[in-house]
From Swiss-Prot:
GO terms for cellular component: extracellular region. This is Probable exo-1,4-beta-xylosidase xlnD. Keywords: Carbohydrate metabolism, Glycoprotein, Glycosidase, Hydrolase, Polysaccharide degradation, Secreted, Signal, Xylan degradation. It comes from Aspergillus fumigatus (strain CBS 144.89 / FGSC A1163 / CEA10). SMART domains: Fn3_like (SM01217). GO terms for biological process: arabinan catabolic process; xylan catabolic process. Belongs to the glycosyl hydrolase 3 family. Its EC number is 3.2.1.37. Glycans are attached at N23, N87, N118, N142, N246, N326, N385, N404, N440, N477, N518, N679, N701. Residues 1-20 form the signal peptide. The keyword Hydrolase applies.
């Protein structure tokens, strides 16, 4: 029997479910956006631990806690037969029964709470805390909050893992930048800014999940995804599984990968997921430039960090990309390029044939499996009850601290887009009309990638549990064109002091495998809002969902008194919205995306990856958009007023020689360009009557270096907690050397001599100018892209 046939027989015997279903249907993935994959679920395998006390491995090096993790993993893998080795190259690994090595599931989810866990029906381990979607959390501009959320998720994940109900590797965070306003998964990301926001989110989330910066004992393994150039699902029939994204070296370096550099170099992420799409003709999971030249040789990916394919993307290297001549070649191309573990069954089914045909070697396959098990060693998988996190239990899941932080994230992220003084509601308001498809929601609060929550508070729930008299009417559905519910809605509005409409978009319109074709309010929601606005009563609109919709008609309608963006606010979302509306809490979130006018979606194809304006493309993201947005990136109103001023010493340095900057000592920093160029320090005074948090975005702009020039770019952000009226507080935002560099056409980060400007927020409340002198200098060298591996 050949090696290939032997492996297939073993797989069918061990895993009669998912792994007995190889991809032989040959779906047309050029138009189908979902992989034909039925992965083994956590619920159907035994997630126990190896017995290093009395089991077959107890006397081997893998159970020796004094040995190096790599050596322990290598010793384990060296004991595998070839068939056993191949069996353990997929996300659903059967382990090695003869060695007492249990099955293992690589694929767990932790985007904003536990998902793909084996939840019980009731009682212990039946739920986990559900935080807001990342797009809303990032809008809070609070680094500490991101880290707290990730830390809690990791704690709860380890508690579930200790009873065999969750894995130790999580497919999170999603750090792709939200470039296209129509992208269905933009809700999962930290917004449209790659260099500053996505990178900061990556750092805080990864270090929270993993328990620090490359700790000796990993808490969980985070997976930075999707690497790289992935930001469409199925736009106009262009499937994510077959998209070939044409990206210049300049924008690949400037926009599509800097967050992955931070994830690898600074946060020391231990796993990276290669994406479905191809870039410049090469599928990401078969792209040695991405996975070796950039990730490992340039970005400094940890030595035993492993690359996981997105689910079935190794198969997609053949179908639909046709980069490889057949599925066996796709498996060989992917492993040789640096994709260590296959989320799917392609490796498990086709490595035998690839080995027989001498397209792969045992050493190439071992490399990936050793990397996976090195991380499991670092996670304490082989350490028995002595594992650092083995004492976490259900009691560590049931904590009001986690619930409070979920609520806090929702409150801090909510953005006040428009307000004429109607909010916060006056004390005299007694009755409210609650209308719209988002008013009485449950799991819709959670967005996507979620598990059961301990509770879900809808806006209707929250108001019903307050002192208001509530008149509720559904009104209309998200995408409905029926007006059958209008009369009931108008009736409820007429007998109320204030009208609140909650609508927008949801996961029926934006989701994984689903992009929008427009950025307008769907259905007849605007028609109903317009009729409500004619009743002569205060009207508040809650615009919900991850992506933005064109709310220009609401912005210009004087009878729409207030407009709030609430994202997907999680388990306490309704309470958070109530508390903002009533003034118990004050809004301070800022948009981390641009709200474009509706015609933007029709001007150029979403598959155009170029950010810089050209042809019919008016430019993408706040950095390059040449049109007039409905609401700018960074927009957000307060219930109070603030005054920002420089301390005024007049002694701060405003001229810097480039060569002096780059030759100075840099203790505490791995690279000199990570050092602060200057500290932007301002005094913030609450000049109004309401206590409020204050949020700031610091932008840079220049005409130094070659044209075209971006409008501006984000170099820092911060949040001050609860500033009382007439009180002042100092805020300092470090501006690093790297943050004022620009990217040349070859992808290099360059410091150019010339005049620069730093401006606080969109309103430019404080402006600081400085000059760089000397000679231009490359501070980050983008490696020359070479020919990729030849297809097998």
């Amino acid at each position: 029997m050949s090696v290939a046939k032997s492996i297939a027989a073993v797989l069918v015997a061990l895993l009669p479910g998912a792994l007995a279903q190889a991809n032989t249907s040959y779906v047309d993935y050029n138009v189908e956006a979902n992989p034909n994959l039925t992965p083994q679920s956590v619920a159907t395998i035994d997630l126990s631990f190896p017995d290093c006390e009395n089991g077959p491995l107890s006397k081997t090096l893998v159970c020796d806690t004094s040995a190096r993790p790599h050596d322990r993993a290598a010793a384990l893998v060296s004991m595998f037969t070839f068939e056993e080795l191949v069996n353990n190259t997929g996300n659903t690994s059967p382990g090695v029964p003869r060695l007492g090595l249990p099955p293992y599931q690589v694929w767990s989810e932790a985007l904003h709470g536990l998902d793909r866990a084996n939840f019980t029906d009731e009682g212990e381990y039946s739920w986990a805390t559900s935080f807001p979607m990342p797009i809303l959390t990032m809008s809070a501009l609070n680094r500490t909050l991101i880290n707290q959320i990730a830390t809690i998720i990791a704690t709860q994940g380890r508690a579930f893992n200790n009873v065999g109900r969750y894995g130790l590797d999580v497919y999170a965070p999603n750090i792709n930048a939200f470039r296209s306003a129509m992208w269905g998964r933009g809700q999962e990301t930290p917004g449209e800014d790659a260099y500053c926001l996505a990178s900061a989110y990556a750092y805080e989330y990864i270090t929270g999940i993993q328990g620090g910066v490359d700790p000796e004992h990993l808490k969980l393994v985070a997976t930075a995804k999707h690497y790289a150039g992935y930001d469409l699902e199925n736009w106009d029939g262009h499937s994510r599984l077959g998209n070939d994204m044409n990206i210049t070296q300049q924008e690949l370096s400037e926009y599509y990968t800097p967050q992955f550099l931070v994830a690898a170099r600074d946060a020391k992420v231990h796993s990276v997921m290669c994406s479905y799409n191809a870039v410049n003709g090469v599928p990401s999971c078969a792209n040695s430039f991405f996975l070796q030249t950039l990730l490992r040789d340039t970005f400094g990916f940890v030595e035993d960090g492993y690359v996981s394919s997105d689910c079935d993307s190794a198969y997609n290297v053949w179908n639909p990309h046709e980069f490889a001549a057949n599925i066996t070649g796709a498996a060989a191309d992917s492993i040789r390029a640096g994709t260590d573990i296959d989320c799917g069954t392609t490796y498990q089914y086709y490595f035998g044939e690839a080995f027989d045909e001498q397209e792969v070697t045992r050493a190439e396959i071992e490399r990936g499996v050793i990397r996976l098990y090195s991380n499991l060693v670092r996670l304490g998988y082989f350490d028995g009850n002595g594992s650092v996190y083995r004492d976490l239990t259900w009691n560590d899941v049931v904590t009001t601290d986690a619930w409070n932080i979920s609520y806090e994230a929702a409150v801090e992220g909510i953005v006040l887009l428009k307000n004429d003084g109607t909010l916060p509601l006056a004390k005299s308001v007694r009755s409210v009309a609650l209308i719209g498809p988002w008013m009485n929601v449950t799991t819709q609060l959670q967005g996507n990638y979620f598990g059961p929550a301990p509770y879900l508070i809808s806006p209707l729930n929250a108001f019903q549990n307050s002192d208001f008299d509530v008149n509720y009417a559904f009104g209309t559905n998200i995408s409905s064109h029926s007006t059958d519910g209008f009369s009931e809605a108008l009736s409820a509005a007429k007998k109320s002091d204030v009208i609140i409409f909650a609508g927008g978009i949801d996961n029926t319109l934006e989701a994984e495998a689903m992009d929008r074709m427009n950025i307008t309010w769907p259905g007849n929601q605007l028609q109903l809002i317009d009729q409500l606005s004619q009743l002569g009563k205060p009207l508040i609109v809650l615009q919900m969902g991850g992506g933005q919709v064109d709310s220009s008609s609401l912005k210009s309608n004087k009878n729409v008194n207030s407009l709030i963006w609430g994202g997907y606010p999680g388990q306490s979302g309704g309470q958070a919205l109530l508390d903002i509306i009533t003034g118990k809490r004050a809004p301070a979130g800022r948009l981390v995306v641009t709200q474009y006018p509706a015609e933007y979606a029709t001007q150029f194809p979403a598959t155009d990856m170029s950010l810089r304006p050209h042809g019919n493309n008016p430019g993408q993201t706040y950095m390059w958009y040449t049109g007039t947005p409905v609401y700018e990136f960074g927009h957000g109103l307060f219930y109070t007023t603030f005054h920002a001023s420089l301390p005024g010493t007049g002694k701060d340095k405003t001229s810097f020689n480039i060569q002096d900057l780059l030759t100075q000592p840099h203790p505490g920093f791995a690279n000199v360009e990570q050092m602060p160029l200057l500290n932007f320090t301002v005094t913030i005074t609450n000049t109004g009557k309401v206590a409020s948090d204050y949020t700031a975005m610091l932008f840079a702009n220049t005409t130094a270096g070659p044209a075209p020039y971006p409008n501006k770019w984000l170099v820092g952000f911060d949040r001050l907690a609860s500033l009382e009226p007439h009180r002042s507080q100092t805020m300092t935002i470090p501006v690093t050397i790297d943050s004022v560099a620009r990217t040349d056409e070859a992808g290099n980060r360059v410091l150019y001599p010339g005049k620069y400007e730093l401006a606080l927020n969109n309103e430019r409340s404080v402006v600081l100018q400085f000059v760089l002198t000397g000679r231009e200098a490359v501070i980050f060298k983008w490696p020359v892209e070479q020919q990729q591996i030849s297809s097998a």
